[in-house]
Amino acid sequence: MLKRNLVNYVKNKDLIEKKIGPFHIIIKDQIEGEVDIEASFGSVIRTLPGHFLTLIDVVYIGQFSFLEEKEVNALYVDGSLFITNVQDNDDDLIDDIIHEIAHAVED
């Protein structure tokens, strides 16, 4: 249900799409904070084994009500990462990405 609602939202919104290494990234809302998306994802790519990265189909960055409701910055759901656009710096974003990829590995 969550994915279906997001897909409908994504179809009706102006988005920025990026491909960084194996990651397909959809930016729903601009990132707030001193963050270099390319550098952050590049660091993750250099840090984690490649087979971990293939567990992620898409990364959504933005404001999501379900993140706020759960009081979390990021969430892994069915091959997708949902990450808040409110990030302090590169390390904050990297931490969120790696933490959620760890959940993908657990599954």
What are these regions (language model features)?
Residues 2-9, 21:
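N-terminal leader/presequence regions that precede the main folded/catalytic core
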Residues 6, 83, 88, 103-104:
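Intrinsically disordered, low-complexity segments enriched in glycine/proline and serine/threonine
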Residues 95-107:
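Active-site recognition of the HExxH zinc-binding catalytic motif
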Residues 6-7, 15-18, 106:
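Residue-level signal for functionally critical sites in structured catalytic/ligand-binding pockets
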Residues 1-2, 70, 107:
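Proteins with a high burden of low-complexity, intrinsically disordered sequence enriched in S/T/G/P/A and R
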Residues 13, 17-79, 86-90:
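Auxiliary, metal-adjacent structural segments of Zn-dependent hydrolase domains
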